[in-house]
Amino acid sequence: GNKELLSQAIKKFENNGFRVFYADTKKDAVDFILKEIGEEKLVVKSKSNVTKEIGLHEYLEKNGVEVIETDLGDYILQLSKEKPAHPTGPACHLSRHEIAKIFSDSFGKNFEPDPLILTKFGKEKIRGYIEKSKIGITGANALCAEEGAAVIINNEGNINLVQMREKKHIIVTSIDKIYPNIEEAINMVKLCTYYATGAPITSYIEITSGVSKTADIEKMLFKGMQGPNEVILVLVDNGRTEAFAKGYKNLFYCIGCGNCLLDCPVYHVVGNEYGYKGYLGGRGASASFFLENPEAALENGLFFCTTCNNCEVSCPVDIGNADYSERLREEISLAGLSFPAHNQVLENIKMTKNPFGDTSKKQIKEGNEVVYYRGCMALYREKNIADSTIKLLEKLNVSYALIDEVCCGSVALRTGNKKIVKELAKENFEKIKKTGAKTVIFSCAGCLRAFMKDYPDLNDTNLEFLHSSQYFLQKIKEGKLKLKDGRKLKVTFHDPCH
């Protein structure tokens, strides 16, 4: 997102002998690469999320160029036509039995489900293609602006072979991969490797800062000694500049370790259907809003995110998808692309002040110590929750109020309808203020989050917000609420996402 750094990087790479092409769109990128391949009918490539993003493999094959993936996991997926399951282990969802069947179906002979046999066969098959190819395509984990060098990491050793093809090495990466210098890039490499595999460093770190060359004979420069005659850098924008300008720059700071997926509750259920091409999970779904279009973001699971923000906790560079997801949902709503069910919920809130469209009469009670905000679920669906909470408040002999509450607005905010939330919040706060109480307790974690986080700018009353479990625990510790002695209870605690 730093224009000066980008400009510095381009200049330095060009000074080092790279040919640099800036691709505004994915079509610009694939058209340019096809032109560079020329008459060649076979290219080998390494694993690259940017090439997945621009659809390079499919585009080249459509135009008569055979493309062979040289990462074993990606090669297996190429044969099976499946989606990747993880950025560093694309075929990790497949068992050895499934991979044996894929090889058997692809090559017309039976393979034993032995990982060593399968790996050795894959290695030999890939190596044969590499030796025949004159053009290699790789991605890049980092571009170093100060040195004009591309950093590419791998464990299999395939990238060194791919980038040493005789004719051309084409590096395809994106404008968010630029680092100030090689030291910063190596820090990223160590971080990525540790969070991806638990190892302190990857097996190979390839650093390319120019073409293969020698001047050993009378200082006469000769290019293409043991490596390619040309190194070409394709810098893909494809919506990133727009994303940076709109305040989504951090969304593209991802280093590709995949650690966020391990703690994502949605990914555990939906798997590799959640996300966009090589960019899996909530971040990928959000990024596809810019890399593709708003409709793609919907298809890739923009509304799947539970907003738990486990991804931010797990991320070594502190990328959290929840806030970005909610902002993009608002853009979806403003563009008129909301789901019919979401529109119905919004209409219900407008008409009845609750998402269910329920017109049941609410119990109202005056009190000046505590306001019990029941929430729509406890008021209209799980009424036993409200009844049980009220019983405990009665036992405490506390002066509690039950206001004529309206929806907290959480469901509206989560579905991209921000405008109505402020109206609901204002109405709730006015009713709470009238009671004179300084503590508000909630049964619903979503309602509690709404009051504490989603509209703190409206909270000028110095109110204390507590979940009912927190409030009653306080009273137990104070000795005001006593549990029956000797009673054995089995308790399940559901730790909420909010």
Language-model-detected regions and their locations in the chain:
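Iron-sulfur-cluster electron-transfer modules
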Residues: 1-102, 291-459
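The feature marks the mature, well-folded catalytic cores of soluble enzymes
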Residues: 1-246
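Flexible, glycine/charged-enriched surface loops at secondary-structure junctions
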Residues: 19, 23, 195-205, 261-277, ...
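Short, flexible loop segments at boundaries between secondary-structure elements
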Residues: 75, 168-178, 238-241, 460-487
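Redox- and metal-dependent alpha/beta enzyme cores, enriched for Fe-S-associated oxidoreductases
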Residues: 164, 178, 403, 491-498
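Cysteine-centered iron-sulfur cluster-binding motifs in ferredoxin-type domains/subunits
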Residues: 249-268, 297-319, 496
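Flexible glycine/proline-rich, aromatic-decorated loop/lid segments
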Residues: 273-294
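Basic- and aromatic-lined ligand-binding clefts that recognize polyanionic substrates
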Residues: 369-373, 476-498
